[in-house]
Amino acid sequence: MCIVSHRYIPLTEKDKQEMLQTIGAKSIGELFGDVPSDILLNRDLNIAESEAETTLLRRLNRIASKNITKETHTSFLGAGVYDHYAPSVVDAMISRSEFYTAYTPYQPEISQGELQAIFEFQTLICELTDMDVANSSMYDGMTSFAEACILAFSQTKKNKIVVSKGLHYQALQVLHTYAKTRKEFEVVEIDLDGTVTDLKKLEAAVDDDTAAVAVQYPNFYGSIEDLEKIHSFIEDKKALFIVYANPLALGLLTPPGSFGADIVVGDTQPFGIPAQFGGPHCGYFATTKKLMRKVPGRLVGQTQDDEGNRGFVLTLQAREQHIRRDKATSNICSNQALNALASSIAMSALGKQGIYDIAVQNIEHANYAKQQFIKKGFEVLDGTSFNEFVVKFDKPIQQVNEELVKYNIIGGFDLGVVSDDFKNHMLIAVTELRTKDEIDTFVEKAGELND
């Protein structure tokens, strides 16, 4: 047998023989001599023979065609992942090799372009949220939320956090996971009054032991919480105010910082990040100058070199685990730099007016859909909303959604998964991409299936 090396394929037969000869072994099997023979797999793995690239691509495309996607179906599914317009320039820019990484650079002095891009992301987040400082991004909005709660515990030295059940249920799950590692932490969940937080119960729960109060804006059920009223409950208790906010909605709604929020977190998925099997996403974390030194994740700052030229650096690194290890503000130092860049490009391409216009379209399209459902005889739950709302059906939502797929429609989220109180309730998302005809068809088919 002729044994040859291959320029691009590692570990050829020739490579194996040379390695075995070097270490004095006769075969690869000899390397596993210490492993009992009865647990060794004494046969080849059941792996198919290689195929030509064209044949393989055809097979993979056939497999992929089984998926239901927003390219083949009209989507009214949201619940944290939305079908929004992404300018074409986003993919063109993030595909540049200089940017194509999920990490902040380890040698920042030679990565000025990447650092400036992250700095611009931080600046855009601060403008949207009306906050002083933002980090370079986090894994997703839910991670950012949990980290915000940890910061509140650390800052206030108190052990209770009061959270609305209007928060995304998975964000609450992440928080409870974090809390399990800290026995002294207490998480108090406040019930809803319809689709918004029960303010009387919230006010009663906030006391001198409260580290923070957290709500979502707009909340998981699509309704807009009264941040001004909620903040009034917190002021004299010396607790922090955490707001989990949809950044696109902030193009129109009054930002949380204007209501006295101490920490604003969320997910920038609505800006330039596609709905790709639920991820990856990009969490943002914004706060006040007072809390700057306790921010998790990495911070990029602007500075000057010895010659007076503008430059960018990773700043305040003493907070991070590679410096302080167990005393770090957070054990997260990785982030979503590539997705943060995508969101930055999308926001920059749209501009302030463009973001505002898209936010307005979301409200208008959602309100139109609401009215059509009401005209069709559905019960639509009350609440001022952005681009999501709740509709009650007479039949199980899973059954309705399975039938809607036959009409190339992806229905809304089954809220019965979250709570028995919302059995047969569908959370419907209507973004700027949904047309009048698509909405009308959805309502018509939903009505037929509900009869």
UniProtKB/Swiss-Prot annotation:
Q: Mind telling me which InterPro entries this protein's record contains?
A: GcvPA, GDC-P_N, GDC_P, PyrdxlP-dep_Trfase, PyrdxlP-dep_Trfase_major, PyrdxlP-dep_Trfase_small
The enzyme's E.C. designation: 1.4.4.2
What is the taxonomic lineage of the source species?
A: Bacteria, Bacillati, Bacillota, Bacilli, Bacillales
Q: What does this protein do?
A: The glycine cleavage system catalyzes the degradation of glycine. The P protein binds the alpha-amino group of glycine through its pyridoxal phosphate cofactor; CO(2) is released and the remaining methylamine moiety is then transferred to the lipoamide cofactor of the H protein.
A Pfam match is GDC-P
Main enzyme class: oxidoreductase
GO MF annotations for this entry?
Answer: glycine dehydrogenase (decarboxylating) activity
Q: Which GO terms describe its biological process?
A: glycine decarboxylation via glycine cleavage system; nucleoside metabolic process
Please state what the protein is called.
Answer: Probable glycine dehydrogenase (decarboxylating) subunit 1
Q: Which domain of life is it from?
A: Bacteria
Catalysed reactions, semicolon-separated: N(6)-[(R)-lipoyl]-L-lysyl-[glycine-cleavage complex H protein] + glycine + H(+) = N(6)-[(R)-S(8)-aminomethyldihydrolipoyl]-L-lysyl-[glycine-cleavage complex H protein] + CO2
Family assignment from sequence similarity: Belongs to the GcvP family. N-terminal subunit subfamily.
Q: How does it assemble?
A: The glycine cleavage system is composed of four proteins: P, T, L and H. In this organism, the P 'protein' is a heterodimer of two subunits.
Q: Which UniProt keywords apply?
A: Oxidoreductase
